[in-house]
Amino acid sequence: GLLDIVKKVVGAFGSL
């Protein structure tokens, strides 16, 4: 769902 996509984006930024 949309929340899953948001979590992936947040996780990506958290990996920077």
Curated annotation (Swiss-Prot):
Gene Ontology cellular component annotations, sorted alphabetically: extracellular region
GO process terms (BP): defense response to bacterium
Tissues/organs with expression: Expressed by the skin glands.
Keyword Transcription regulation: no
Keyword hit for ATP-binding: no
Entry keyword set: Amidation, Amphibian defense peptide, Antibiotic, Antimicrobial, Secreted
Compartments reported by the entry: Secreted
Modified sites of kind Leucine amide: L16
Highest taxon of source: Eukaryota
Coiled-coil segments: none
Membrane-crossing segments per the record: none
Family: Belongs to the frog skin active peptide (FSAP) family. Aurein subfamily.
Reported function: Has antimicrobial activity against B.cereus, L.lactis, L.innocua, M.luteus, S.epidermidis and S.uberis. Probably acts by disturbing membrane functions with its amphipathic structure.
Name of the protein: Aurein-2.1
